[in-house]
Structures are given as structure tokens and as C-alpha cells.
């Protein structure tokens, strides 16, 4: 099996295809500290792309309540259980990825979810329970945890080394050279569901009506027009930013994605130990048990939390974070000028100019021209 360089685990690993990165790679950053699980992103995606027959339980975008929420049920605890206990040595992953762990003849470690695992999309299930019942074959095991929780928004990761691409016997799944978006050719797909079994994040879905698999297409018609996807532009919490990140050896500091991912390392991949090099990155929640965050986001979680807590002291960092939710256009470069952040598209055109701090306006108690006094009604 060929060797590829996965920068997220800081080493080479096995992958069925030779290393070939696209010209540019679509990437997202989600700030978990701001997500309120309003599901606006979920419904925006649902009404745009998956409102047809056979798509009743297809959620290309979903928001889960962690630590006990999943869609499909138990997706992450099940793949982690199959992978077994692994370890990091410093910043290097010393364990096995899903491409290295299986025994022959299997090439990818995975499982096929039961149809009932899709019965509940984890909408509104956000309560931390006092008592966790530990019973046979129950997904939730272990001691009662302190009352903390957070919301995890999930879409297809458009991975650099997609398990779905590696698993498809029909070669119906491909990664676009121009932007790194992973798509399924539905004319070639025969519905074998090997992509569903192989993807550790369980983001390909099988349509029982059309008998083919479907997945997030990253709203590529909008991307091709220089606009961010539906789930990003409709987010009322302004937790999302989409752009294109550079290759690990060609980082551009004035690119907000590169700055947050490669320079500051405040945005981290979800379960990097799985080995797919996902391209959806998360700013971890600051109030969650660090052991849980390290398992989910890797050994950089501690540093990321500290950076976020002290972000107000870093003008460049605040400048990049201020771009979240402030424009529908894709920001290619940015710079901080005075107390404002200015974002530019790929052609160098200014598309957004926002203050680092929201201005405060105090209206006068009296309008001198008319002599009228103003009163607050709130």
C-alpha cells in the first residue's frame, strides 16, 4: 500500500492511493464556543439539498449534543472502540489509523450502521443526565461525568485522504482537483454502501428510493461563484468560516484559514487519529474536560483553549476570528488596519470591513433642535 504524508498526525501512513493533493483545498472552521444548536444550518442544508424522497433521515449537516449525542447513533464511540487504545508521543501519532489497523483482507477499518441508528437525528437532546445507566450493549458506559456539554456541528470533512474514495469498488467517488471537494458520481454508484461502511464520520448516506449513496457537495454551485455554502451563511451564531487552506508547506499568513489552522493552531481537526486528514476544523470549547478534548481534537487542544481564552490580547487573532459570519463571500486574504479587519477575495477586491470591537453609541437625552427629551422604553 502506498505511503502518504499526513501532517495532522505528523508522520507518513498507509493509504490505498498515491499522495496527490488538489490545487487548493476547501476547508471550514467551526467555533464550538458559540454554537447554540439552533439547527438553522441543519434546516438550511435540509431544505436546499435533502428534501426529496428517500432523504427523510439524510442530514448532510447535523448538530450533535456532546458528550452523549450522535448521528448516526454512537458513530464516534463505535469507531474508536474498533480502533482500540492508541497513543500520541508528543505531537506525533504513534498509534494506527483506520487504514493501518484492519487485518487482511480488509483495507479500511469500519462498520455498517444499523438502520435504527438513524432513527433520531439528535435534535434537542442536550440535557446532561444525573444518572447514566450502565447496561449490556448500551452505548453509554462509565462513571457519571460532571455537568458539562457542548454542541458539535458536523458536515462532510472533504478529507485529504477520504476513506469513502478508498473504499468504493465502482470508483464512483472522487476528489475535485480544483477545490478538493469530494463528490459521488451517482451514475457510477450502484449502492453497495462501502462508502457508508468505510467513512469513520458516517457522512455518506444511502437513499433507499434512488438506491445510490449521497453526501454533502459543499454547495459547490455557490463555491464556484465565490460564495460560502448554505450552512455557513445561514448560521445565526456566526460560528462558521469557509475558505481554502494552503498546502502544509506553502502556508500564507494573510489567509485566515491558514492563519487559524497552521500558524496559530487554534483550529483543530476532528479525530485526527483516524487518519483521513479531515478539512473541517474546530475551535474546542473552553469549559470541557481536557481529556475529552484531547481524545476528540488531538494533543493541541490545551494550547487551543488557552489561545482562545487570551484572544482579546492578540489583534491578529481577533482580526481573523471577527471574519466569522460577516460576509457571504469567500475571504482569500485579510489584514488588520487600526481597529478594523478587512477581507479580500481571490482577485484582491475588498469584500468585508468590520470593527474588531462592536462600537457603542450613546444617544443624547435631549434633541437640541426641537427641545424634545428622549426616553427609553426598555
List PLM regions with ranges.
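Non-ligating segments of multi-cofactor redox enzymes
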Residues: 1-378
Amino acid at each position: 500500500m502506498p505511503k502518504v504524508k499526513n501532517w495532522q498526525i505528523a508522520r507518513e501512513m498507509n493509504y490505498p492511493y498515491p499522495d496527490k493533493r488538489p490545487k487548493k483545498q476547501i476547508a471550514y472552521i467551526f467555533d464550538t464556543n458559540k454554537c447554540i444548536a439552533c439547527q438553522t444550518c441543519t434546516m438550511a442544508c435540509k431544505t436546499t439539498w435533502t428534501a426529496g424522497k428517500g432523504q427523510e433521515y439524510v442530514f448532510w449537516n447535523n448538530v450533535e449534543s456532546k458528550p452523549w449525542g450522535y448521528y448516526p447513533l454512537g458513530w464516534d464511540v463505535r469507531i474508536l472502540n474498533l480502533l482500540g487504545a492508541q497513543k500520541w508521543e508528543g505531537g506525533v501519532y504513534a498509534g494506527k489509523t483506520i487504514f493501518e489497523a484492519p487485518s487482511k483482507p480488509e483495507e479500511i477499518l469500519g462498520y455498517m450502521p444499523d438502520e435504527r441508528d438513524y432513527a433520531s437525528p439528535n435534535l434537542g437532546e442536550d440535557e446532561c443526565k444525573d444518572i447514566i445507566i450502565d447496561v449490556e450493549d448500551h452505548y453509554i458506559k462509565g462513571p457519571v461525568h460532571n455537568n458539562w456539554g457542548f454542541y458539535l456541528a458536523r458536515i462532510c470533512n472533504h478529507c485529504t485522504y477520504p476513506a469513502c474514495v478508498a473504499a468504493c469498488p465502482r470508483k464512483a467517488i472522487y476528489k475535485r482537483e480544483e477545490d478538493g471537494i469530494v463528490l459521488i458520481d451517482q451514475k457510477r454508484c450502484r449502492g453497495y454502501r462501502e462508502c457508508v461502511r468505510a467513512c469513520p464520520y458516517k457522512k455518506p448516506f444511502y437513499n433507499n428510493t434512488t438506491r445510490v449513496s449521497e453526501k454533502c457537495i459543499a454547495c459547490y454551485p455557490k463555491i464556484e461563484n465565490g460564495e460560502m455554502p448554505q450552512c455557513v451563511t445561514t448560521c445565526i451564531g456566526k460560528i462558521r468560516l469557509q475558505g481554502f487552506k494552503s498546502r502544509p508547506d506553502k502556508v500564507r499568513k494573510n489567509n485566515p484559514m491558514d492563519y487559524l489552522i497552521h500558524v496559530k493552531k487554534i483550529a483543530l481537526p476532528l479525530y485526527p487519529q483516524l487518519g483521513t486528514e479531515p478539512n473541517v476544523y474546530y475551535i474546542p470549547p473552553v469549559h470541557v474536560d481536557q481529556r475529552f478534548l484531547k481524545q476528540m481534537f488531538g494533543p493541541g487542544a490545551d494550547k487551543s483553549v488557552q489561545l482562545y481564552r487570551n484572544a482579546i490580547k492578540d489583534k491578529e487573532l481577533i482580526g481573523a476570528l471577527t471574519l466569522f459570519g460577516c460576509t457571504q463571500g469567500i475571504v482569500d486574504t485579510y489584514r488588520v488596519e487600526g481597529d478594523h479587519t478587512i477581507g479580500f477575495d481571490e482577485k484582491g477586491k475588498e469584500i468585508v470591513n468590520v470593527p474588531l470591537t462592536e462600537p457603542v453609541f450613546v444617544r443624547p437625552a435631549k434633541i437640541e433642535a426641537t427641545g424634545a427629551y428622549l426616553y427609553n422604553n426598555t
